Amino acid sequence: MLNKLIKVIIPVILISIILLISLKTYKDTKNSQTNFLTLLPENTSLILKINNLDKFKSINSNKIINKLKNLIDIDFLINNTETIKSVLRHELLSDITSLNVSLHKTGNNNLSTLFTTQLSNNYISFNKNFEVREYDKKNIYTTDFNDNKFHFYKFENILFFSKSKFIIEEVIKTQYSSYNLINDLTFQNSYKTINNNADANIMINFKELANTSSIFFKNKLVVNNFSSWSCNDLEIKNDLIIANGFLSTNKKIEHYTDILENQEPKKIKITEIIPENTSDLFSIGFNDAKLLLENKNKLLQKNNNFWNWDKYRKSLIDSSNVNYNELIKKIDSEAGNFKTSHLNSSHNYNYFKSNNSVVLISYLQPIIKKIKTYNNKNIYYCLDYNLTHNLFGSIIQTNTPYFTIINDYFMFSDNANSIKYLIDNFISNNTLINSNHFIKYNTLLSQKSNLTIYSNPGKSFQKFHNDLRKDYKKKIKINKDSISNITGLSLQISNKGKLLSSDFILFYDRDFKQNLQEEWVVRLDTQIITKPYFVKNHFTNDKMILIQDTSNTLFAYSSEGKLVWKKKLNNKIIGEINSIDFYKNNKYQCIFNTNSNLHIIDRNGNYVE
């Protein structure tokens, strides 16, 4: 579910950038005094409201915009930009006083862009270059711009225009329907908080955005009940895109964010545990776990899923005497899931923080069994393999039976090797909080929140791109130089009384230097006690990598990560491992000391005589 949420957010950013770039040369537009929102169709997923187009003239000088532009096919970008410029230069639009852009899903896999503007004069004349047709007793006017047909419709002093005639027809239908966006209380409560003096405002309908996302991706993203409307002030800086605003909650608990009502924002500490190469993180912060579970169950009832959940809860009590309603009282202030990006593979995890891990592990004894100890950490198997999912909702992934405990955090995954990988990184202090790409980004985040979604585009963009539909794979391309310095994309939601604050951030770190990329990884069942040593292999003209474990076994690996040999030594290696040409014949051996012997070993693992 975390991946799905991230996939929804990234297209929003890219589409918004395309629209802003397309409009950057248009000048002197004033704020709209007429409420254009009343005629927007119900399938509106995003509204971009431009308040100061003068500031957008310099948008292309921003480094973050240039980097994002490099992810968009140049022909697609230029064609759309030039077409919009041509439309806005038309005499029909010479005196417009507002300009707004909205996105709509039309049909199964079509995205329609609707432009709305206020006219200074209620009377305008469509010249002979416009074709006219009637729809539901209203006139729609059509003309060509750069070989692209645009359709226009005027209602009072508001002009609508789009390349999609279908969305213009939807506007006309809305005029006669009972639907009115400004009567939607979730939108109304958020919209009244926006600042009309901001450079721009962006309003996001998460429900419709979930449907719109199916246009971009092969499979529909099931996040329909994540949230309602979020209305934000948008600011674009040289290295930063920020959208700050609010979304409202519903006491009837209709969306996942509604379950956060009355919860205090909490500090995000899981970053001190999870690996440096975390690509995506979904974190929930709360002060009342019992209330969170109750609200989550109300959401299940709303979606007709509570009966099955409660049936399983009762069966768990009967079989083990473990009760979710009692278990939740032993959970502290954090829960969520995260994903790491590692070579060509990934690891997925769920987690929650306990009040006291000793007390909780004791309570869970009837449904868990210890399977092994790894680097002084116990690894367990939980018979309730959907435990975290059942406690915190469908937004948390299923099937994570393996777990370990780190600093009172219960860390779950779908396989034991992923748990080992987590333990290795934690012991090595190779954690997200210490990573060079996250340190600067972390200063932009609110340290306390009720919900944080974080993604590192440099690590997650490949997966995002693979999931795109074929047509959009061509339009949105992978450019590692452009994406590597974009080190963070996040959404944070926090309780602010009757509303929830929402903060979007996209950050370009001009100073970030990518670490050397791992090409392979080896997992041993024991702990390594030496750093890797690189010695010459004259046969392959490459390097061999030598490491020693706690049993004093020396392992030799090729540069491709294949085990070449291993040898049991009498003691721990003292000092360095070096290369030597013992016979002066350009054939190299490795040389090192233990406390009782000098060792010279050839490339095959044999001692030199």
Q: What are these model-derived regions, one by one?
A:
Residues 7-146, 184-223, 242-346, 359-372:
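Structural boundary/hinge residues at secondary-structure and domain interfaces
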Residues 55-56, 122-125, 167-171, 179-181, ...:
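Short loop/beta submotifs within extracellular cysteine-rich repeat domains
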Residues 103-107, 134, 154, 236, ...:
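Short, low-complexity Ser/Thr-rich regulatory SLiMs
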Residues 110, 121, 153-159, 240, ...:
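Short, solvent-exposed coil/turn segments at beta-strand boundaries
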Residues 159, 348-350, 410, 554-556, ...:
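Hydrophobic beta-strand positions in blades of beta-propellers and related beta-sheet-rich domains
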